[in-house]
Curated annotation (Swiss-Prot):
Disulfide bonds: none annotated. It is found in: Cytoplasm. 4'-phosphopantetheine is transferred from CoA to a specific serine of apo-ACP by AcpS. This modification is essential for activity because fatty acids are bound in thioester linkage to the sulfhydryl of the prosthetic group. Belongs to the acyl carrier protein (ACP) family. Pathway: Lipid metabolism; fatty acid biosynthesis. PANTHER family: ACYL CARRIER PROTEIN, CARRIER DOMAIN-CONTAINING PROTEIN. GO terms for molecular function: acyl binding; acyl carrier activity. This is Acyl carrier protein. PROSITE patterns: CARRIER, PHOSPHOPANTETHEINE. It comes from Campylobacter lari (strain RM2100 / D67 / ATCC BAA-1060). Carrier of the growing fatty acid chain in fatty acid biosynthesis. InterPro entries: ACP (IPR003231), ACP-like_sf (IPR036736), PP-bd_ACP (IPR009081), Ppantetheine_attach_site (IPR006162). The modification O-(pantetheine 4'-phosphoryl)serine is found at S36. One of its GO terms (biological process) is lipid A biosynthetic process.
Length: 77
């Protein structure tokens, strides 16, 4: 779960949340309190961390941390 750990670090840094609340099933907006600007900044930070490009149309589908992890795993295949 190395990708999850890296995603968690980015989420904690970007959203200023405690790492204990960042779980695979956590919803980025509802559970972690992100607003639309937070989501944009989070996506940009994830793109930089993993050296990937996440189109806006895909970013809208990333609701839970699990979605982010799976998306990045698929990009790295």
């Amino acid at each position: 779960m190395a990708i999850f750990d890296d995603v968690k670090k980015v989420v904690v840094e970007q959203l200023s949340v405690d790492e204990d609340v960042v779980k695979m099933e956590s919803k980025i907006i509802e559970d972690l309190g992100a607003d639309s600007l937070d989501v944009v900044e989070l996506v940009m930070a994830l793109e930089e961390k993993f050296d990937v490009e996440i189109p806006d149309s895909d970013a809208e589908k990333l609701v839970k941390i699990e979605d982010v992890v799976n998306y990045i795993e698929n990009l790295q295949k």
